[in-house]
Regions:
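Glycine-rich, Arg-bearing micro-motifs that act as flexible, cationic patches
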Residues: 106-128, 139, 143-146
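Solvent-exposed polar/charged
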Residues: 25, 100-101, 128
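Short, well-ordered secondary-structure micro-motifs
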Residues: 16, 43-46, 96-97, 118-120, ...
Length: 156
């Protein structure tokens, strides 16, 4: 059993990450922070690369670094308690597959930044495919407060 959170590095996803960490602590289950990357453009029939010359390894390293930085910044001393996972594929598919593999109790996602109260394409996909509850965090949500911390004090 786990809590799975999708992290894309955006401010709303960082808020979702903090909330997911709090949920994982309350439930006494591991936190899994997930990021996805799409493979770079392929080669046409002639064998010459089109588009970017980045490789899958470049994309993976960049995504892993961004996820590690986000978790470290948002969770501080508790960052080492999060299991970080980076996979190639569409974000919604990666989140659902991770949730299934880890028997997630909860999936936490940020709402689309442009529409704070509406789900984006990733969250719509996850909402329809998830086998567990999904918490959708509005993009304007304040950072969560731990249950044992008085209101007004910042979560560290």
């Amino acid at each position: 059993m786990t809590v799975v959170v999708g992290v894309d590095g955006s401010r709303p996803s960082r808020t979702a990450l903090r909330l997911a960490a709090q949920e994982a602590r309350c439930r006494q289950v591991p936190l899994i922070a997930v990021s996805a990357y799409e493979p770079p453009l392929g080669k046409p029939a002639g064998g010459y690369p089109i588009g970017t010359l980045h490789t899958d390894d470049d994309e993976r390293v960049t995504t892993e670094s961004a996820l590690r930085d986000a978790v470290s910044k948002e969770l501080g001393d508790q960052a080492n308690q999060a299991d970080l996972r980076v996979s190639e594929g569409l974000a919604g598919h990666v989140i659902i597959e991770t949730a299934r593999q880890t028997h997630a109790q909860l999936i936490v996602l940020a709402a689309s930044p442009g529409k704070p109260m509406l789900p984006g394409t990733v969250s719509q996909y996850v909402l329809h495919k998830a086998e567990c509850p999904v918490m959708l965090v509005p993009s304007g949500s304040p950072a969560p407060q731990p249950a044992d911390q008085p209101k007004g004090e910042a979560l560290r």
